[in-house]
Amino acid sequence: ECFIFNSSSMAGAKEIIVKVIPTNIANAFVKKNHYSGKVVANSKLHFGCFLKNKLGGVMSFGSPLDKGKMLSLVDTNNKGKNKKWNEMLELNRMAFTDLLPRNSESRCIAISVKLIKKNAPQIKWILSFADSTQCGDGTIYRASGFKLTSIKLNNQLFELPNGMKVHKMNF
């Protein structure tokens, strides 16, 4: 067998186009390509990551799922009545395929954050979680400028009799 490497046929992360996509397209992609196979119902803003007009990644943002975990970060005195909740988004789901080149995740996060800042200036910060039991320890988030606030044992998942793993928040 003979293999020829043609560097001009390889696409780089800088060629990716990031744009808002409809919820139904984002959700179908996430169900197919995210390790959990699940979407987050409160995700309202979805970015598609395209290379050569093909969808290769989706990032879904919404309000934080568990405000209780965030109280110490955004609310010290107001007992949950802090207006800062409207200044925050959570990156609820990120699903990418191998169609996209190396460093695509961090590049797409950076572009989506710039688009959010430009079009929704009230958003002051973005939160996300990395599930180290499935997809690493947050290296991509740190490479994108996120700050690691804590590492905790995930005791929120349990396995159903059919083998499916679900989060306790589903019940």
Where are these regions (language model features)?
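A short, polar/charged loop/turn motif at coil->beta-strand junctions and beta-hairpin connectors
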Residues: 12, 24, 55, 83-85
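Short non-domain terminal segments
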Residues: 1-3, 59, 169
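Short acidic-hydrophobic surface loop/beta-edge motif
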Residues: 9, 47-49, 158
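Extended charged
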Residues: 1, 9-10, 126, 165
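Conserved beta-hairpin
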Residues: 30, 43-63
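Short amphipathic alpha-helix that is part of the acyltransferase structural core
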Residues: 2-41
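Acyl-donor binding region in acyl/amide transferases
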Residues: 17-20, 62-171
